[in-house]
């Protein structure tokens, strides 16, 4: 089985492309079924395995397959699934085989490949991806082992290095940007759209600034209400957004919507109602919640996840020593995993040997039972049984020895001596 990771992320593709390749949660299970079918074939000795990781910053396909053309098949599937021409998608895609795929998984889970160096959210997202793949019946021995070791490595990296300390989160970066627009965040009204983990983090950071008002709008009213109450805020129906948008100076949005929920026209009306007082907007969703054209309005300051990433990266340089430590740990664990993977390659051969030997045994036992039932001498039957088993079990090795010549023959002889420890060595002339 070959391991392969294929995907795009914030290093290789802008948010405009990432949002087109993202998988909504409800689509992942059925997508896994069609993705696995790419690698199914009559010649495949093993069932292919797959998992999909889709976040704001990356969409990645992890697979284990016998298909030697897996890279081309995976890229073609991703292109067809999202209806994006291969020529448009391919320049932004990375394909990582074997040890590169393992190293990448370890780095991603440890926060080394994140926009926010050392952030922990990605680890939870990977665990969710594995849980979804398991429920879809898409995981097997290889990816299960890969992800279990991935989680163990992430725990080791975070427990033995300072990779996650003093990191500037996306939420903190949003507050810093708001402070560039408004002298005091405490004088502003803040609206959060959504009630997921990212919005919760942002609400925590903005609430620490003591805003004039904090409001949460969410499709599920109960969940929005609970989040608002945590920060002494209020909840409002998401349906009221078009008519109340003008009330807010700061708007932070991060929902799972597949289409924008804030359009250009609605923001234009809000700006007019505010008499052109500025609105600071942060769109942390992928796909985006706010139409990108909104950013062209004169009195609107719109920032996406990629924009916040520039601020986040400013704080990454100071932790390069921790990065070096983490990379060293990961490299050791990659080698350990590849050793395990190498041992797995002989499992089908061993299984076949067991099956073949057992078939020979059963055939000879059945023959012996018939002879005994006929009344033949038990001692003679047992002797014939043991002789037949001996001849059949050594037939393969002796035939192989007779077929090869030269260096191959010498290598095979040495190999056979290892199998049969009592075989005499070439310099043993005693015959014993």
Swiss-Prot record:
The keyword Oxidoreductase applies. Pathway: Porphyrin-containing compound metabolism; protoporphyrin-IX biosynthesis; 5-aminolevulinate from L-glutamyl-tRNA(Glu): step 1/2. The keyword Cytoplasm does not apply. InterPro entries: 4pyrrol_synth_GluRdtase (IPR000343), 4pyrrol_synth_GluRdtase_dimer (IPR015896), 4pyrrol_synth_GluRdtase_N (IPR015895), GluRdtase_CS (IPR018214), GluRdtase_dimer_dom_sf (IPR036453), GluRdtase_N_sf (IPR036343), NAD(P)-bd_dom_sf (IPR036291), Shikm_DH/Glu-tRNA_Rdtase (IPR006151). The record marks 104 as: Important for activity. CDD domains: NAD_bind_Glutamyl_tRNA_reduct. The active site is at residue 56. Keywords: NADP, Oxidoreductase, Porphyrin biosynthesis. It catalyses: (S)-4-amino-5-oxopentanoate + tRNA(Glu) + NADP(+) = L-glutamyl-tRNA(Glu) + NADPH + H(+). Its EC number is 1.2.1.70. One of its GO terms (molecular function) is NADP binding. One of its GO terms (biological process) is protoporphyrinogen IX biosynthetic process from glutamate. PROSITE patterns: GLUTR. Substrate binds at residues 55-58, 114, 119-121, 125. NADP(+) binds at residues 194-199. Belongs to the glutamyl-tRNA reductase family. Catalyzes the NADPH-dependent reduction of glutamyl-tRNA(Glu) to glutamate 1-semialdehyde (GSA). Homodimer. During catalysis, the active site Cys acts as a nucleophile attacking the alpha-carbonyl group of tRNA-bound glutamate with the formation of a thioester intermediate between enzyme and glutamate, and the concomitant release of tRNA(Glu). The thioester intermediate is finally reduced by direct hydride transfer from NADPH, to form the product GSA. Possesses an unusual extended V-shaped dimeric structure with each monomer consisting of three distinct domains arranged along a curved 'spinal' alpha-helix. The N-terminal catalytic domain specifically recognizes the glutamate moiety of the substrate. The second domain is the NADPH-binding domain, and the third C-terminal domain is responsible for dimerization. This is Glutamyl-tRNA reductase. It comes from Burkholderia cenocepacia (strain ATCC BAA-245 / DSM 16553 / LMG 16656 / NCTC 13227 / J2315 / CF5610). The gene is hemA.
């Amino acid at each position: 089985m070959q391991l392969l990771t294929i995907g795009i992320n914030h290093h290789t593709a802008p948010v405009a492309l990432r949002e087109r390749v993202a998988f909504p949660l409800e689509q992942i299970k059925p997508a896994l079924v069609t993705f696995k079918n790419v690698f199914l074939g009559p010649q495949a000795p093993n069932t292919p395995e797959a998992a999909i990781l889709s976040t704001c910053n990356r969409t990645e396909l992890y697979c284990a397959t016998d298909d030697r053309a897996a890279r081309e098949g995976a890229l073609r599937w991703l292109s067809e699934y999202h209806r994006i021409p291969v020529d448009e998608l391919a320049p932004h895609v990375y394909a990582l085989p074997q040890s590169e795929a393992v190293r990448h998984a370890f780095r991603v889970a440890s926060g080394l490949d994140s926009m926010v160096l050392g952030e922990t959210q990605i680890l939870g997202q990977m665990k969710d991806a594995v849980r979804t793949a398991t429920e879809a019946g898409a995981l097997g021995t290889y990816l299960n082992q890969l992800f279990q070791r991935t989680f163990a490595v992430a725990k080791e990296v975070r427990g033995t290095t300072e990779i996650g300390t003093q990191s500037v989160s996306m939420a903190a970066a949003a507050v810093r940007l708001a402070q560039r627009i408004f002298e005091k965040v405490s004088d502003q009204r803040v609206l959060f759209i959504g009630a997921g983990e990212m919005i919760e983090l942002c609400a925590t950071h903005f609430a620490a600034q003591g805003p004039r008002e904090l409001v949460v709008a969410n499709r599920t009213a109960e969940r929005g209400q609970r989040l608002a109450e945590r920060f002494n805020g209020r909840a409002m129906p998401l349906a009221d957004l078009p008519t109340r948008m003008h009330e807010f100076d700061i708007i932070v949005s991060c929902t799972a919507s597949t289409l924008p929920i804030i359009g250009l026209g609605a923001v234009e009306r809000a700006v007019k109602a505010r008499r052109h007082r500025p609105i600071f907007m942060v769109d942390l969703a992928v796909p985006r919640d706010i139409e990108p054209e909104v950013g062209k309005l004169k009195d609107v300051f719109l920032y996406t996840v990629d924009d916040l990433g520039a601020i986040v990266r400013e704080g990454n340089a100071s932790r390069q020593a921790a990065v070096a430590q983490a990379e060293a740990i990961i490299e050791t664990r990659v080698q350990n995993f590849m050793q395990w993977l190498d041992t797995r390659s002989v499992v089908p051969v061993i299984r076949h040997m067991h099956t073949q030997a057992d078939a020979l045994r059963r055939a000879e036992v059945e023959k012996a039972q018939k002879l005994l039932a006929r009344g033949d001498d038990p001692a003679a039957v047992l002797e014939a049984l043991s002789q037949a088993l001996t001849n059949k079990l050594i037939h393969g090795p002796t035939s192989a020895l007779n077929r090869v010549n030269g260096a191959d023959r010498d290598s095979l002889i040495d190999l056979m001596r290892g199998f049969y420890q009592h075989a005499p060595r070439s310099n043993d002339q005693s015959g014993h």
